[in-house]
Amino acid sequence: MMRSHYCGQLNESLDGQEVTLCGWVHRRRDHGGVIFLDIRDREGMAQVVFDPDRAETFAAADRVRSEYVVQITGKVRKRPEGAVNANMASGAIEILGYQLNVLNEAETPPFPLNEYSDVGEETRLRYRFIDLRRPEMADKLRLRSRITSSIRRFLDENGFLDVETPILTRATPEGARDYLVPSRTHAGSFFALPQSPQLFKQLLMVAGFDRYYQIAKCFRDEDLRADRQPEFTQIDIETSFLDESEIMGLTESMIRKLFKEVLDLEFGEFPHMTFEEAMRRYGSDKPDLRIPLELVDVADQLKDVDFKVFAGPANDPKCRVTALRLPGGASMPRSKIDEYTKFVGIYGAKGLAYIKVNERAKGVEGLQSPIVKNIPEANLNNILDRVGAVDGDIVFFGADKFKVVSEALGALRIRLGHDFELLTCEWAPMWVVDFPMFEENEDGSFTALHHPFTAPKCTPEELEANPATALSRAYDMVLNGTELGGGSIRIHRKEMQQAVFRLLGIEAEEQEEKFGFLLDALKFGAPPHGGLAFGLDRLVMLMTGAQSIREVIAFPKTQSAACVMTQAPGMVDAKALRELHIRLREQTKVE
């Protein structure tokens, strides 16, 4: 081997021993005739000292520059008093170098690694192989590896089998657009890259494998946000003969053990909350419980007021009128309120009403707001009592369609929690349960809230009679307002699966065409089964404190779903297109 140790492995126990290191020159310093090189490798850094007594080695050290790849042999020695570097794992020792081989030279990097500052993300992604040399980036990928190792170990110990499922499959309606792959041997036909291994893992349960897992690549051609990538990694789990409480208990144990092993954090039992309660209190099905602010419904106090902005939604069963109290917010300037008004507009809110509570003892005179003159004093007091308002608070209001108010004030709740530093703890895991089976569209049609294979908490007949009120056997694990994973008990009877398809507007012919293999499988003794899938990238993002999942993926795509390093996607030549039976249509230019 070319090295005896990694830099991060060196410590005082090796004092006096000869070591050989291989790595990159992170920093070079010349201090009065003595040259110091900070050598960096995957595991950390070490300081190497070269003195002029060894003329040939000293001259070689004098020639090296940042990012040269070197092999160094020397003797470990303790650093002098006052020279210990507490910020470096090997900071108590240094190596007296007496042999240096330059394995490769390096041009000046496009951005400095040792004084990293405001480098644009596109530049970082263009030179990702340089960006990943930075210790903080390498630390994230090392932690990612520890996370996957911990998860694999837990699942292996609990009897799960790691089974790979196909990457080339057929398109099925799962919500997002598929990435399509043209077939050369079947002209005019296309494979689809999987959005998840959902159907294959269910078929593995039908086949009797009982406990399956896979750390799987998944693909979705969708609009990208901070927590989305066109290709992402999923921790995919499926079991037979367990109900939802048992699956939730098992996967919760996995996450608790993971945080203990990797971050030395102890979690207690995760609280459970229904979807209805989460939406009512927090305006979100993935509430951040670290923030002690809640939405409070006040429609009953505003049904008869002479103020249509409130009275209209208060009397509409599809709408919601909600208050959100911010303690100590009465001193907020109008410019800040305008900023928050613009913010909730992103979610469809037409405005943001408010009341500043200056001095409740003075009645209406002690309240500052353009809306108080439209609401009877008794109703105002009832509202302020209900939200717990005291002098110095501000109360915001939302009145609109249920979804608009929930999303707008739910997002405002999060924004206020961070802007005013209200977080009560660092970590807040939880479960959300009892999701609706379907989301009703404006035209009266239905969309599956999770996916079409989720089992309901009722019979097929009850489901078809009352689809809008049916609850599913679905469950989501949420951490700090981020959905870590979602799962459900699956449909294992053909009649129920056909009923769900019908409610989604998928008639018998289309069912057979797109899902015939699944319906066939359900005829041949499918066991009760269910599972859960975690987003690995999101999990690593949370555990490393990264701001985006792009920070925890080795080679991510940009927000426009492109790789600036490899220039993918790229054009292909005409011959390759002909073999795939594809002809590109010329785009007409708009004058």
Curated annotation (Swiss-Prot):
Keywords: Aminoacyl-tRNA synthetase, ATP-binding, Cytoplasm, Ligase, Nucleotide-binding, Protein biosynthesis. Its EC number is 6.1.1.23. Its main location: cytoplasm. It comes from the Bacteria. SUPFAM superfamilies: Class II aaRS and biotin synthetases (SSF55681), GAD domain-like (SSF55261), Nucleic acid-binding proteins (SSF50249). The keyword Metal-binding does not apply. Residues 198-201 are annotated as: Aspartate. One of its GO terms (biological process) is aspartyl-tRNA aminoacylation. The record marks 31, 82 as: Important for tRNA non-discrimination. One of its GO terms (cellular component) is cytoplasm. L-aspartate binds at residues 174, 220, 450, 490. It catalyses: tRNA(Asx) + L-aspartate + ATP = L-aspartyl-tRNA(Asx) + AMP + diphosphate. The keyword Aminoacyl-tRNA synthetase applies. InterPro entries: Aa-tRNA-synt_II, aa-tRNA-synth_II, aa-tRNA-synth_II/BPL/LPL, Asp-tRNA-ligase_1, Asp-tRNA-ligase_1_N, Asp/Asn-tRNA-synth_IIb, AspRS_core, GAD-like_sf. ATP binds at residues 220-222, 229, 483, 535-538. It is found in: Cytoplasm. One of its GO terms (molecular function) is nucleic acid binding. Aspartyl-tRNA synthetase with relaxed tRNA specificity since it is able to aspartylate not only its cognate tRNA(Asp) but also tRNA(Asn). Reaction proceeds in two steps: L-aspartate is first activated by ATP to form Asp-AMP and then transferred to the acceptor end of tRNA(Asp/Asn). Belongs to the class-II aminoacyl-tRNA synthetase family. Type 1 subfamily. Homodimer. PANTHER family: ASPARTATE--TRNA LIGASE, MITOCHONDRIAL, ASPARTYL/LYSYL-TRNA SYNTHETASE. This is Aspartate--tRNA(Asp/Asn) ligase.
